[in-house]
Each structure stands twice: as C-alpha cells, then as structure tokens.
C-alpha cells in the first residue's frame, strides 16, 4: 500500500476547489514511480494532449479503477482492483470559462470510483479528467453517461510543469537497491538495450 502525504497533492485552485467543475482538479505526485509500484512493473503512461475543440460524436474513453458494481447491464464486468476501460462518444460540450476550460458529457459506462480517471480522445491522448456521471445500479449501459473537464491551455501547462518538476528522469534507485532508468518521456526501459551518454546498457524484464 502506498500512502500519499498532503504535500503530494497539488490543487489547481484550492481556494475555490468546491466552486464548479472547472476548479475540481488536482494532481497527485506518487512517492515512487508508478511503473515500479505496478503489478509486474508493467504500467505505462498515456501522453497528454494539447487543448482542442471536441464535437458531439467524437470518440472518448476513460481508464481507471472503479469500485465493484453489481449492475447486470454493464457491457463488461467490473472486478475491484483491476483496470477498467470504458469507451463512448461525446454527447455535449459546454464552456466553463473564457480561458478554454470546457466541460463535456459522454455516453459511456460510468460507475462509482471512476472519478479522477483520465478522459482519453480518439488519438489515445489524455484531454481531461472524469468527474461525474451515472453511479446507480440497474440502469442499462446505453443510458449511462459520464462527464468531466477538458483541460484549458493554462491547465495543460500546469500539468506539464508538475511533470517536468517531479517526474523521474534518468537513474532511479529503489526496490531493494535495484536501479531503473527512465527516459525524459517517463518510459522505464525493460527488455532492451540503449545508449545512455557514451555507454550502452542492457535492461532485463525487471
């Protein structure tokens, strides 16, 4: 179990956190790289998209760890603690402010525990954060919906700045003294060779 400290949580607008979905945004810096903490060290990251306009009908997905749901109408069963991906399409788009922050709703499986999951566009990039939607059991999957925030240009920069400041790059020592190498993009090298500086290294599956 990994415990977060208060200083690991970075609020977009802590003072007005509860005033509107446009302020319901925070980033958490993990105490250890998630690739190392994940099962089989297999975690990967989805790239961050630049701000753009979305239209009804555009494909979107969410990926997260929802709590168990007993609703028999869901397309795929939800198993507590296992990654769950839901696919859907944009239903509507609303402007939150004049800085490019938008709210979108989408036809999609939405259950309790998905809040905080990334909203992923058709290009496979994170555009925002899932915030709300259908959580009741017994509602057919076709009638379930979700909604969240599409990051404004300013919010995209804010996230990038956090990654640049806290993201692991280069050699990381942990996990009983083992050393791991992370590229500037956040990839952890496994099962490959790479030239770093003037030396060639070989990385095993660990």
Residue map of PLM features:
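Extracellular adhesion/carbohydrate-binding repeat motifs centered on closely spaced tryptophans
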Residues: 168-206
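Terminal peptide-recognition signature
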Residues: 28, 57, 62, 106, ...
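Short glycine/Trp-rich loop-beta-loop segment that forms part of the substrate-binding cleft
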Residues: 33, 47-81
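C-terminal subregion of chymotrypsin/trypsin-like serine protease catalytic domains
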Residues: 98-101, 111, 115-167
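Conserved catalytic-core segment of clan PA serine endopeptidases
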Residues: 1-41, 94-98
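Acidic glycine-/aspartate-rich tracts in secreted/extracellular proteins
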Residues: 31-35, 66-68, 125, 132-136
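A structural micro-motif recognizing beta-strand termini
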Residues: 28-35, 49-51, 107-110
């Amino acid at each position: 179990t990994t415990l977060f400290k208060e200083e690991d949580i970075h609020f977009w607008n802590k003072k007005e956190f509860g005033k509107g979905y446009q302020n319901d945004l925070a980033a958490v810096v993990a105490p250890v790289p998630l690739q190392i903490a994940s099962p089989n060290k297999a975690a990967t990251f989805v790239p961050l998209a630049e701000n753009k306009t979305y239209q009804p009908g555009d494909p979107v997905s969410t990926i997260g760890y929802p709590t168990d749901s007993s609703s028999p109408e869901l397309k795929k069963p939800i198993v507590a603690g296992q990654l769950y991906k839901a696919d859907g399409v944009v239903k509507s788009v609303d402007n939150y402010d004049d800085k490019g922050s938008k709210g979108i709703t989408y036809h999609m499986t939405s259950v309790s525990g998905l809040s905080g999951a990334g909203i992923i566009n058709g290009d496979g990039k994170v555009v925002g954060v899932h915030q709300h939607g259908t959580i009741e059991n017994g509602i057919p999957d076709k009638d379930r919906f979700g909604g969240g925030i599409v990051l404004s240009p300013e919010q995209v920069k804010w996230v990038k700045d956090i990654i640049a400041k806290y993201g692991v790059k280069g050699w990381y020592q942990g996990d009983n003294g083992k050393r791991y190498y992370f590229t500037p993009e956040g990839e952890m090298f496994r099962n490959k060779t790479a030239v770093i500086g003037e030396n060639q290294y070989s990385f095993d599956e660990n």
